């Protein structure tokens, strides 16, 4: 997920308060103590959590030499980049060489360009403004941009009960909508979109903050492109929520519930040959997502049905994709 920092130099209490309320990740200030009095947030200051010149380097790009200096610093430290005439080209060059670049921006337009430069975007942005309304607007942009997911239709090939086991419900701190879900899989090479519990049914009330995600061993896709085991999710962590069009956003984990339940196995294949499978609870309220965004209960699922999923780079080490021979089956 992109970092959202706000520059409070010179001191601006309204901007800092709005930054904290909008979920900013850090505030750059002359005195960390001024920020800490308003709320808990990472500070970048001589007396802060991150110290300029040590943990964070600030560079102004004026020519190729300063660009090279920023790239060199970005190999092992966060670099805040400023340009005298804000352009995309220096950022493209820097993003190609470092994944620790934070771009200084002044408005929503500049923030959007920086977030999407070379598709992967910068590590984060530093907003320099005296207008709290701009802070809110840029915060909304950054927090809604957790990266798109390329969803494709999978054809169900098999579904059958496998017995009793432990499954995980992921309760988030967000209200999810119809068509929203999380991506899970028995392997890290392909995952299926499991629908949130947003729908009315005769048996239980909707729980629109919840996804009944799957068995404890399953992988879940996170906002930074990494994966985690469902059993390892914990309060305060973050998960990726995607709609049926692949638009992703981050959600905070409020709690997880692990309970022993009857399980079933779903297997599906994409047109390109990718094979996905997932073990889910065998209950009417557990649903996968059709290409049109509608929800299909696992009790009604049949071979030949189309459901959404994604194919990923297989092989993970501590949740990160690795290039080595790893077979998952």
Swiss-Prot record:
Catalytic reaction(s) noted = 2-amino-2,3,7-trideoxy-D-lyxo-hept-6-ulosonate + NAD(+) + H2O = 3-dehydroquinate + NH4(+) + NADH + H(+)
Task: Give the top-level enzyme category.
Answer: oxidoreductase
Pfam families in UniProt:
DHQS
Q: Which keywords does the record carry?
A: Amino-acid biosynthesis, Aromatic amino acid biosynthesis, NAD, Oxidoreductase
Q: Name one GO molecular function term.
A: NAD binding
What EC number is given for this enzyme? 1.4.1.24
Q: Enumerate the PANTHER family for this protein.
A: 3-DEHYDROQUINATE SYNTHASE (PTHR33563:SF1), PTHR33563
The name under which this protein is listed is 3-dehydroquinate synthase
Q: Gene encoding it?
A: aroB'
């Amino acid at each position: 997920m992109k970092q959202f920092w706000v520059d409070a130099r010179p001191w601006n209490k309204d901007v800092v308060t709005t930054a904290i309320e909008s979920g900013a990740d850090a505030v750059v200030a002359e005195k960390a103590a001024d920020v800490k009095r308003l709320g808990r947030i990472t500070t970048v200051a001589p007396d802060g959590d991150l110290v300029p010149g040590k943990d964070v380097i600030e560079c102004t790009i004026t020519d190729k030499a300063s660009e090279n200096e920023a790239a060199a610093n970005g190999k092992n430290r966060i670099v805040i980049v400023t340009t005298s005439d804000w352009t995309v080209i220096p950022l493209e060059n820097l993003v190609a060489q470092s994944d620790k670049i934070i771009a200084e921006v002044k408005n929503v337009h500049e923030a959007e360009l920086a977030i999407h430069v070379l598709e992967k975007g910068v590590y984060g942005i530093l907003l320099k403004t005296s207008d709290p309304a701009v802070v809110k607007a840029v915060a909304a942009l950054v927090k809604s941009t957790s990266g798109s997911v390329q969803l494709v239709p999978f054809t169900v090939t098999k579904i059958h009960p496998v017995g009793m086991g432990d499954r995980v419900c992921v309760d988030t701190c967000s209200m999810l909508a119809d068509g929203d879900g999380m991506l899970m899989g028995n392997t890290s090479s392909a995952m299926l979109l499991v629908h949130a519990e947003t729908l009315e049914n005769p048996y239980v009330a909707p729980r629109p903050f919840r996804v009944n995600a799957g068995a404890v061993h399953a992988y879940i896709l996170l906002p930074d492109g990494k994966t985690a085991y469902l059993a390892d999710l914990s309060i305060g962590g973050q998960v990726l929520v995607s709609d049926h069009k692949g638009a992703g956003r981050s959600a905070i984990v409020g709690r997880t519930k692990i309970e022993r339940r009857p399980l079933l196995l779903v297997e599906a294949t994409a047109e390109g040959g990718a094979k996905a499978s997932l073990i889910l609870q065998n209950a009417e309220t557990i649903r996968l997502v059709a290409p049109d965004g509608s929800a299909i209960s696992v009790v009604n699922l049949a071979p030949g049905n189309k459901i959404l999923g994604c194919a990923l780079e297989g092989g993970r080490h501590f949740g990160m994709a690795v290039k080595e021979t790893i077979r998952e089956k």
